[in-house]
Structures are given as C-alpha cells and as structure tokens.
C-alpha cells in the first residue's frame, strides 16, 4: 500500500473519533498487516473502545472471474499474506490482543457466521469483483451514519470498480467517491438528518 493511502486511513481513523461515530473497524484483505496495524494503533487508543476485525484467507486471492477483465486474469499475482507477520507487527506496536479479531478463511465461508456489530470504518482491499461485492453486501448495512467505506483498488482493478459502482447504483446511494491516489477511493455513509444539522 502506498503512503498516500496509509495517510488517508490514518486521517479517517481520527475522523471517526472526531465525529463520535460508534462501532469497530473492519478490514477485508489484510495481506501482511501494514494497514491493519496502522488503523489498530489509532483505533485501539480511542475513547470509544474500538476493536479491529481482520478478514483474510492468508492463502492468497481467489482466482479472478470474467468480470475482473483480462488484466486481472493475466496477472498471476495472488498476494499470499502471512498471519505470523500480522501478529508480530501488532506485538511490536503494543496493540492489545483483546482488541484484535482475526478471522482466517475465504470470505464466503467466514462472513455468514461472524457478527461484528456496528462498524465505523470499513476498509476493503479485496481486488476482485466477487470479493468486493461480498464485502459491501455483508458489511455496508452495519456501517454507521458518518462512518467511512474505503475501497483500496477502485482505480486499478476493473472488477473492483464494477462491484463498487453496481452496489452504489443498486442501493441508490448518493455519495461522493473521494480520490486518494490513482486507485484508492473512499466515501462517507450519509448522516441522518438530525446529525447533519448538528
């Protein structure tokens, strides 16, 4: 992940505290834990007692489908994360184990059985169409008004963009996709009318 995207995640983790958005942080697609560690170092010190939920197979990415385009299917890069590296970086940063929930497995297998509760920030770094679609469908409704949804690969992978655009269109969500760099985007879940007037 490039520095601009890390800086943006750091800013958004602080912003959800400033706005007092309730809920935890959820990351789908952890790899070796760099962005997760950054978010955890901010959020676990929050007065709102946030936890960080991390979802990854740690066996690489699933194979892309036709909806991901030729570029994805030709890349041959499957991004195997290392769970031991994730645990090590948390230990080095002094992040309490009680604040971290690591869920190992494929999204379609783990999502149905896990209850995260309210979400203040959802970070999706899942690359492919089906994976991004699963993440949005499973967790968006738990994102609290004023919370943020971060899409890491919107500008790079065709399938990620397609899944995001379809979800926003199908839900009739009128949101602004804020550009972080050539690929990263995020949007804020609309505030309820009473919150917007505060």
Feature map (PLM): residue ranges:
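Conserved SAM-binding loop and adjacent beta-strand
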Residues: 1-8
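S-adenosylmethionine/decaboxylated-SAM
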Residues: 3, 14, 19-198
């Amino acid at each position: 992940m490039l520095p601009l995207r890390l800086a943006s995640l750091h800013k958004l983790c602080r912003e959800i505290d400033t706005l007092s958005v309730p809920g935890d942080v959820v990351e789908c697609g952890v790899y070796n834990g760099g962005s997760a560690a950054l978010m955890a170092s901010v959020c676990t010190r929050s007065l709102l007692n946030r936890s960080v939920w991390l979802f990854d197979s740690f066996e690489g990415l699933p194979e892309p489908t036709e909806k991901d385009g030729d570029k994805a299917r030709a890349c041959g890069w499957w991004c195997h994360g290392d769970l031991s590296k994730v645990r090590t970086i948390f230990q080095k940063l002094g992040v309490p184990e009680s604040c971290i929930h690591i869920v190992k497995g494929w999204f379609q297998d783990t999502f149905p059985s896990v209850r995260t509760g309210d979400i203040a920030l959802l970070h999706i770094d899942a690359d492919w169409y089906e994976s991004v679609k699963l993440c949005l469908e499973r967790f968006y409704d738990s994102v609290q008004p004023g919370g943020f949804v971060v899409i890491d690969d919107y500008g790079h992978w065709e399938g990620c963009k397609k899944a995001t655009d379809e979800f926003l269109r199908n839900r009739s969500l009128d949101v602004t996709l804020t550009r972080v760099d050539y690929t990263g985007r995020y949007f804020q879940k609309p505030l309820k009318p009473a919150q917007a007037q505060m």
